[in-house]
UniProtKB/Swiss-Prot annotation:
PANTHER family: 3-OXOACYL-[ACYL-CARRIER-PROTEIN] SYNTHASE 1 (PTHR11712:SF306), POLYKETIDE SYNTHASE-RELATED (PTHR11712). This is 3-oxoacyl-[acyl-carrier-protein] synthase 1. The keyword Lipid metabolism applies. SUPFAM superfamilies: Thiolase-like. Belongs to the thiolase-like superfamily. Beta-ketoacyl-ACP synthases family. One of its GO terms (molecular function) is 3-oxoacyl-[acyl-carrier-protein] synthase activity. It catalyses: a fatty acyl-[ACP] + malonyl-[ACP] + H(+) = a 3-oxoacyl-[ACP] + holo-[ACP] + CO2; (3Z)-decenoyl-[ACP] + malonyl-[ACP] + H(+) = 3-oxo-(5Z)-dodecenoyl-[ACP] + holo-[ACP] + CO2. Keywords: Acyltransferase, Cytoplasm, Fatty acid biosynthesis, Fatty acid metabolism, Lipid biosynthesis, Lipid metabolism, Transferase. It is found in: Cytoplasm. One of its GO terms (cellular component) is cytosol. Its main location: cytoplasm. The gene is fabB.
């Protein structure tokens, strides 16, 4: 089987809209969570979010953007950055059947869908006032459809949607297609729009943080005793994933080699993780116990139950060996939902490159179950050779990815 490496990254997130901004935020432990006046005005319980502010979105012309929802726009910017970062010539990736794209979103595009529903309720003439571009804007494969068209991708092109594990599945699938010789290079990632319409759905579930509306920077509290739910966010990320010899032939910079990937299902509960699925996933990605892990970027979202179940799963996986250093970057960024998997892989790659571990911020009273679990609470300068990133989602879907410094 062929070896697979990562040669380019692009990101739009609550802590920065490019590699330089994100690196600075990670190292300094900067929170991207802010107060939301819009959420307050609607009377939502939660009034904080990891907002996305993207001026460069204006580079997309009206002709291009009319089919795009915000997740597609974020993804367009991330892909432009990833291409530039990987130093790929247009002549190579365009119209090349050996170059593909796999990118998805974990949630429905609620902003466009709800706007359409409201229009239908208010108007008898349903054909009037609805955008002719709405079908593409709201279809689950909207991101991959728009990007593959705009960037002239000829290889495999489709979307995966698996809740908060979406973009991690996209990365893993790209890895396997290249590993088995189906493609030589794949753009892989995902995007999620941040909107009031989407936030309302999670607010109704009482899944969002509500106790820190007056102090938004402290609202995302993974592993703190007083955590009370996740903070919603969004954004996009894109990786350039490439066969090793292809990367070497063009003298590309290699962030890391992908050496492990697994995907499992809990098969037990829609919203409460079993823990068993996570254990099986991490063990499969590690191929038993053959791959030691220096650092683990946890899924950790700040929910009362989910954080503990993942920690217990990690404890069992590493029961008789050295535990990896652990941090939860969602404590800074909030939860990017379908974009979180690729976001956290990018954060992990930056830590590998610059030899540090970003902190889990906002731990004022460490959860007792997290004691002796090597939770990093302050930026730590240390060389990392091998790292794992976990992404889990509603429906009991689990992904573990392992990368190694090349």
């Amino acid at each position: 089987m062929r070896r697979v490496v990562i040669t380019g990254i692009g990101i739009v997130s609550s802590i920065g809209n490019n590699k330089k901004e994100v690196l600075a935020s990670l190292y300094k432990g900067v929170s991207g969570i802010v107060s939301s006046e819009e959420m307050k005005k609607l009377g939502m319980r939660s009034a904080v979010w990891g907002n996305i502010k993207l001026e460069s979105i204006n580079i997309i012309t009206q002709k291009l953007s009319r089919f795009m929802n915000n997740a597609s726009r974020y993804s367009f910017v991330a892909m432009m950055e990833a291409i530039k970062d990987a130093k790929i010539d247009r002549e190579y990736y365009q119209k090349n059947p050996r170059v593909g794209l796999i990118s998805g979103s974990g949630c429905s595009f609620s902003k466009n869908t709800l706007t359409s529903d409201i229009h239908l309720m208010k108007n008898k003439h349903i054909s009037k006032g609805i955008s002719p571009y709405l079908a593409v804007k709201t279809m689950p494969s909207g991101i991959s459809a728009c990007l593959s068209t705009l960037f002239k991708i000829y290889g495999v092109t489709y979307s995966i949607s698996s809740a908060c594990a979406t973009s991690a599945h996209c990365i893993g699938n790209a890895f396997e297609l290249i590993q088995f010789g189906r493609q030589d290079l794949i753009f892989a990632g995902g995007g999620e729009e941040i909107s009031l319409e989407l936030a309302m759905q999670f607010d109704a579930m009482r899944a969002l943080s509500t106790c820190f509306n007056n102090d938004p920077k402290k609202a995302s509290r993974v592993y703190d005793v007083y955590r009370d739910g996740f903070v919603i966010s969004g954004g996009a990320g894109m990786l350039v994933i490439e066969e090793l010899n292809s990367a070497l032939s063009r003298s590309a910079y290699i962030y890391a080699e992908i050496i492990g990937y697994a995907a499992t299902s809990d098969g037990s509960n829609i919203v409460v993780p079993s823990g068993d699925g996570a254990i099986r996933c991490m063990n499969l990605a590690r191929k038993g116990k053959n791959i030691p892990i220096d650092y683990l970027n946890v899924h950790g979202t700040g929910t009362k139950i989910g954080d503990l179940i993942e920690l217990e799963a990690i404890r069992k996986v590493f029961l008789n060996e050295k535990k990896p250093m652990i941090s939860a970057t969602k404590s800074m960024t909030g939860h990017g939902l379908g974009a979180s998997g690729v976001h956290e892989m990018i954060y992990t790659l930056l830590m590998l490159k610059y030899n540090f571990i970003a902190p889990t911020i906002n731990i004022e009273n460490l959860e007792p179950c997290a004691e002796n679990m090597n939770i990093i609470q302050k930026t730590t300068n240390i060389e990392i050779n091998t790292a794992m990133s976990n992404s889990f989602g509603f429906g009991g879907t689990n992904v573990s990815l392992i990368v190694k410094k090349y």
